[in-house]
Every structure is written in C-alpha cells, then in structure tokens.
C-alpha cells in the first residue's frame, strides 16, 4: 500500500467462526487510526483444502492480507507454502504458538477447532446459572422454578445458599427455598414432576449452635425463639413433611463441607 487512501483488505480464514483472528485484527487496527479504508472479509468453517486454496487465490488477486486461525497442520502447511510462492502477506495466529507451547511444556494440544467458542459457551452457561441461582435464592421467586436443575430446601442455617452458589459456579441452575412452618410453599412447586429436590438437614443442637453464633456476629441476642431447641425441632419436623411431599433426597450437612454436599448432589444430577 502506498498511501492511507487505498483500501486495506484483510481476509480472515478459520476452521471455526473466526472470532479469535477478528479480535486480533481489530485490536491491531486500533494502532493505525489514520487507516480509514479497511475491508475485512471472513471465511469461516473452512474444512476443504480446495476451498482454502480458492480463498488464497482470491487474496492474491485482491492484494489482501490473510490472517488465519487454523488448527489443522496440513492446512497451515498448505497456507504457508501458497503464501511464500505467491508473496501473499500471511499471518498464522495459531500454529506457531501451539508449537512453541508444545515444545516448552511437552503438553499435547487438543488440535480441536472452535475450542475457544466451546470455552465461551461454557462460560456463558455458568453466568446464566449464577444469575438464575441468585434470582431464585431463598425463595425469592417461584415462577420458572421448573427450569432449575435442582431445588434445595431446608430450614435456616443448613447451608442452602452457599451450596446453591457453589453449584451455580459449576453451571447448574439451582433454586432454594427456606422451610418455615408458618410460610406455605406455593402449589406450583409441588406440581413440578421432573424437578430433582434435595432436602438439607442437621441435628437440632448443631443448628442451634450455628444460629447462636450467627446472632452474636450480627450483634443480636443469642437467646431467642429462633435459636431455641424447641423451635428448631418444630422446624425440622415440618421440613421432614416437606421432604416426603417433594420426594426429596435428604442430605445431612452436619460437619460437612460445601464441597462434600455438592459432590453428593452432582452424582445424582449426573444420572439424569
């Protein structure tokens, strides 16, 4: 190119969507604010060598720069060979770095197309699960509870919220409902036939100690109806009734870590 008024043509060639090369190109172009005439063409899902050669030939005819994110070693070799023979400006974002990392670590690369997109899909699935679990935490919502991968129920201080958030970070949509004898559970919860339900429980003394510690931390009286053994036994009795009605798998969380309880739940969810 002789001046900034000429059109800079860039071809993105990928065996997947081509997002990686596109981001790199856009990041690079920010270093050239005076280049106002830029034309970017994307050629995604290139799986055939002849198709690849056709793109390279077009790049030669249009004096375009070619940027690739191709995992296939044979495709990369073909691209480099054609570019060298025909003096095409050619940038290979993938193979050289893969080779360097492989040599440096002796690790074996996946050599899988679209691995970043799959990683992004997993990331957004996790974000969606976290957003759902926050919305359906502590019985705040019931409308779309059937979308949950699991429902966790239990009396106060049985680790419902920490367990829900831990599982949400693993991509599971979790709803949780606190069980209080004076607060009825909506009928639509009982109508969910395919919803996997887990009931959390512990001994009255264990729960009482946790509640007293919680009250002291908040600067409240450690002696109240909320902390009394009689009240807690009443709540646990009510919880057992709810567990039966919901056909819940019961988990005793006493002295268990969140990871232990989550592992147990994940085993059940994996069977679905």
Curated annotation (Swiss-Prot):
Alphabetized, the UniProt keywords read:
Kinase, Nucleotide-binding, Serine/threonine-protein kinase, Transferase
This protein is called Putative pyruvate, phosphate dikinase regulatory protein 2
Q: Which domain of life is it from?
A: Bacteria
Q: Which NCBIfam families match?
A: PRK05339.1
Q: Which InterPro entries match?
A: Kinase-pyrophosphorylase (IPR005177), PPDK_reg (IPR026565)
**Residues that coordinate or bind ADP:** 154-161
Organism the protein comes from = Staphylococcus epidermidis (strain ATCC 35984 / DSM 28319 / BCRC 17069 / CCUG 31568 / BM 3577 / RP62A)
The answer on whether this UniProt entry bears the keyword Kinase reads yes
Substrates-to-products reaction catalysed: N(tele)-phospho-L-histidyl/L-threonyl-[pyruvate, phosphate dikinase] + ADP = N(tele)-phospho-L-histidyl/O-phospho-L-threonyl-[pyruvate, phosphate dikinase] + AMP + H(+); N(tele)-phospho-L-histidyl/O-phospho-L-threonyl-[pyruvate, phosphate dikinase] + phosphate + H(+) = N(tele)-phospho-L-histidyl/L-threonyl-[pyruvate, phosphate dikinase] + diphosphate
Function, as annotated, reads:
Bifunctional serine/threonine kinase and phosphorylase involved in the regulation of the pyruvate, phosphate dikinase (PPDK) by catalyzing its phosphorylation/dephosphorylation.
Family from the record: Belongs to the pyruvate, phosphate/water dikinase regulatory protein family. PDRP subfamily.
Q: Keyword Glycosyltransferase on this protein?
A: no
Tell me its EC number(s), please. 2.7.11.32, 2.7.4.27
Name the Gene Ontology molecular function terms of this record: ADP binding; ATP binding; phosphotransferase activity, phosphate group as acceptor; protein serine/threonine kinase activity
